[in-house]
Amino acid sequence: MNAKKLSEIIKSHKLWLGDNEDGIRADLSGADLRLANLSGANLSGANLSEASLSEASLSRADLSGAKGLLSAANYLDAHFDRTTDGYIVYKTFGYLYIPPENWKIEPGSIIEETANPDRCTECGSGINVAPFEWVKSKYNVDIWKCLIKWEWLPGVVVPYMTDGKIRCEKLQLLEVVK
């Protein structure tokens, strides 16, 4: 979607929010909004179903009541097993990136990394993890079963356009499963 068309939709949406009869609720379903600057935009109540938000700038944007955004809580529940301690996730090491020297890759070890908090960034800094089947389908190396403890959930980021991966800032390594 080009910037002019997007600007027109947002202006009309603003009128709709103000109960102006000339306004129309923004329907951005399926729109390609990659790299769009939506900073400060009021998209409250907009339909964003299946809109591509990868790398879109949403700082200070109002997304309250927006439809179609991926719920992080629902995604975690649907794709990861729960235990009494937290969520079970899976990870590989050394395939794409060399692990930081301060990470001890051994059972019981807890690793930490600053996670990019931007949900519009599909693959960002942090400890990237995924469901077992996703990891197994992508990598032919050892797969670690890991735990994200309940108290560490504030450091978890589920990108709006995830291809299966999520990222976190703290993780406990449990065991190699493959």
Model-derived regions, located:
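ADP-ribosyltransferase catalytic core
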Residues: E113-Q172
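C-terminal accessory domains/tails appended to large, multi-domain proteins
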Residues: L174-K178
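ADP-ribose/NAD+-binding catalytic cleft of ART/PARP-like enzymes
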Residues: S64-G124
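Generic structural microfeature
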Residues: K4-E8, W103, S125
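Pentapeptide-repeat beta-helix register
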Residues: E21, A26, A31, A36, ...
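Extreme N-terminal leader/activation tails
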Residues: M1-W16, E21
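A residue-level signal for beta-strand positions that form part of recognition/binding surfaces
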Residues: R25, G86-Y87, I143
